[in-house]
Amino acid sequence: MKDPQAPVVSRPVFLPTARAQFAAAYPEVPHKLAHALADHPLLGIEALARLGEALPPGAVEYNRGDLPIGVDGKPAATGLTIGETIRRIDTTASWAVLKNIEQRPDYAGLPAALLGELRPAIEARTGSMLKTQGFVFVSSPEAVTPYHFDPEHNILLQLRGTKVLTQFPAGDARFAPDSVHESYHLGGGRELAWQDNFMPYGTPFDLAAGEAVFVPVMAPHFVRNGPAVSISLSITWRSEWSFAEADARGCNMLLRRLGLNPRAPGRYPARNLAKATAWRTYAKLTGRR
């Protein structure tokens, strides 16, 4: 039985050089950094299959992995269970994500332990870490995670296999139109429309076990797995800056409905407080959230 007092990680995952690289680039510059989390016993195939079976249905997502870069809506399901998908991931042509792993006791301290190593650099720039979460991705050989964006600050740690994560500039409306940002923050999907002429503007990050990449808030990206099974861990967090950017998008949606063409929220260090406050006031008065 696992000792409840045992540390989740027994040594630092991010060494001083990696922490310095992160501090210099955060929160807007995507970059690679080294980590020492490979071969963790909680992150092997059988352990993850059991985790997937233990998580509530809303915390697992799995579907076909033999996809194009761009898809219209959610990809199709495979007909397998989450346990079958992960245990047979080498042959199922699938992609699976286990969400909010911190809700399970054995995994509760893992995202916190890793983010704790980076807390000083994070809080010096964007203040308190909010809504810290962990996500595990298990992918078949050559699987594709289609083009999308995410609202969190994100570090993706590669644990097994290889993949290429290709990022595009965050906040550039060529790659994610303002109207799509606005609809996402009001409950729309995170999938984005792909055009082949985007490719020259992307920055590919080749990842092998022991390497990680930082993905800024709402930076469009897609992922292509290598020729072997891949396991990756995302540790994510929100900040008051990221929430203000999202709420400013909500305000812009209201302005757009009035026939205006509002300016997009500024990227860090712009604070977007006026529009964020206006949206929060509107939301409170109308019961939006």
PLM ranges: what are they?
Residues 102-136:
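A gly/proline- and charged-residue-enriched helix-loop-helix capping module
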Residues 158-214, 219-220:
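Double-stranded beta-helix
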Residues 178-179, 227-243:
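A short hydrophobic beta-strand segment most commonly corresponding to one strand
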Residues 131, 144-154, 200-201:
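A short beta-loop-beta micro-motif enriched in histidine and acidic residues
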Residues 1-95, 287-288:
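N-terminal auxiliary "cap/dimerization" subdomain that precedes the catalytic jelly-roll/cupin core
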Residues 204-206, 235, 239-289:
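Conserved double-stranded beta-helix
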Residues 135-149, 168-172:
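Conserved short histidine dyad/triad with adjacent acidic residue
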Residues 148-151, 158, 168, 225-228:
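Short glycine/proline-enriched turns and hinge-like loops at secondary-structure junctions
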